[in-house]
């Protein structure tokens, strides 16, 4: 399969995983390894250097040099807060990669498009590699691309809902128009949904809740890895066209033409 490229960096896996909701750092690490993900997100609100478990979680990730740690700004409510969080992350974690999340509504956690665009413009100016989480809005995604975002990350459904690709028609347009990688983020609840996103032409998917709340998270991580690989292979193989009428795979020409 073709490798994923983001901001000049190559990734062997098209499955990104989050680190929230796991019962322990041991389980989180086992999931990351089973997924074979090369991009792992961690919420900045959980990062307090010297605090113990969160530090342990981060150390579990960074001891695998093949994995890129992607801090995210989950919990911030404005561009100003996002920029402050980004600078703290760069200092604490020594990375300029950032998953930008700005969602002021604590109930639905939907991203604020205006503040996200403002934050992206300023963070790019400051030298960050910005991966913004956004509504599945094709116009907004083009503005973010023009502002210098390294990817766009439209939601499939609200965070943690496991409802799947409720925004699929808008995602199709975003994929068609985008000149930067499109990563489907939020709402994916089953491996089949991840495969569908990849078949549509998404460059990657990010999954957290669907793995973390599974009865067997490690096996679920493996299932998502295989689904993402299968979906991408199907996309690269070029799916057949959808028809409204039947077309025989074995034509009846000369069938039982006996003399």
Curated annotation (Swiss-Prot):
* Assigned protein family: Belongs to the ThiG family.
Checking HAMAP family in the record gives: ThiG (MF_00443)
The UniProt record gives the binding positions of 1-deoxy-D-xylulose 5-phosphate as 160, 186-187, 208-209
Native species:
Porphyromonas gingivalis (strain ATCC 33277 / DSM 20709 / CIP 103683 / JCM 12257 / NCTC 11834 / 2561)
Q: Which SUPFAM superfamilies match?
A: ThiG-like (SSF110399)
Q: What is the lineage of its organism?
A: Bacteria, Pseudomonadati, Bacteroidota, Bacteroidia, Bacteroidales
User: EC top class, in one word?
Assistant: transferase
Keyword set, alphabetical order:
Cytoplasm, Schiff base, Thiamine biosynthesis, Transferase
Name-wise, this protein is Thiazole synthase
Q: Which domain of life is it from?
A: Bacteria
Q: Recorded GO terms, molecular function?
A: thiazole synthase activity
Q: In which pathway does it act?
A: Cofactor biosynthesis; thiamine diphosphate biosynthesis
Q: What is the reaction catalyzed?
A: [ThiS sulfur-carrier protein]-C-terminal-Gly-aminoethanethioate + 2-iminoacetate + 1-deoxy-D-xylulose 5-phosphate = [ThiS sulfur-carrier protein]-C-terminal Gly-Gly + 2-[(2R,5Z)-2-carboxy-4-methylthiazol-5(2H)-ylidene]ethyl phosphate + 2 H2O + H(+)
Q: How does it assemble?
A: Homotetramer. Forms heterodimers with either ThiH or ThiS.
Keyword Transcription regulation among record annotations: no
**Location (main, coarse):** cytoplasm
Q: What does this protein do?
A: Catalyzes the rearrangement of 1-deoxy-D-xylulose 5-phosphate (DXP) to produce the thiazole phosphate moiety of thiamine. Sulfur is provided by the thiocarboxylate moiety of the carrier protein ThiS. In vitro, sulfur can be provided by H(2)S.
Q: Which InterPro entries match?
A: Aldolase_TIM, Thiazole_synthase_ThiG, ThiG
Localization terms from the record = Cytoplasm
């Amino acid at each position: 399969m073709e490798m994923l490229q983001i901001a000049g960096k190559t990734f062997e896996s098209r499955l990104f995983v989050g680190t929230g909701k796991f019962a322990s750092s041991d389980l989180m690490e086992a999931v990351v390894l089973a997924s074979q993900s090369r991009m792992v997100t961690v919420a900045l609100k959980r990062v307090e250097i010297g605090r113990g478990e969160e530090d342990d979680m981060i150390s579990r990730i960074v001891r695998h040099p093949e994995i890129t740690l992607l801090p995210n700004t989950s919990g911030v409510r404005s561009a100003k807060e996002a920029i402050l969080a980004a600078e703290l992350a760069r200092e604490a974690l020594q990375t300029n990669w950032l998953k930008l999340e700005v969602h002021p509504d604590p109930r639905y956690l939907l991203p604020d498009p205006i503040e996200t665009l403002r934050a992206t413009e300023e963070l790019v100016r400051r030298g960050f590699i910005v991966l913004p989480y956004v509504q599945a809005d094709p116009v907004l995604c083009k503005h973010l691309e023009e502002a210098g975002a390294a990817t766009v990350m439209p939601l499939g459904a609200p965070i943690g809902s496991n409802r799947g690709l409720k925004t699929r028609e808008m995602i199709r347009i975003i994929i068609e128009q985008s000149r930067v990688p499109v990563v489907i983020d939020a709402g994916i609840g089953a491996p089949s949904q991840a495969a569908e996103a990849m078949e549509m032409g998404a460059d990657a998917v990010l999954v957290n809740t669907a793995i973390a709340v599974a009865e067997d998270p490690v096996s679920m991580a493996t299932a998502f890895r295989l689904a993402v690989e299968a979906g991408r292979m199907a996309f690269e193989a070029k799916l057949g066209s959808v028809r409204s009428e039947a077309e025989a795979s074995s034509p009846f020409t000369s069938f039982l033409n006996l003399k």
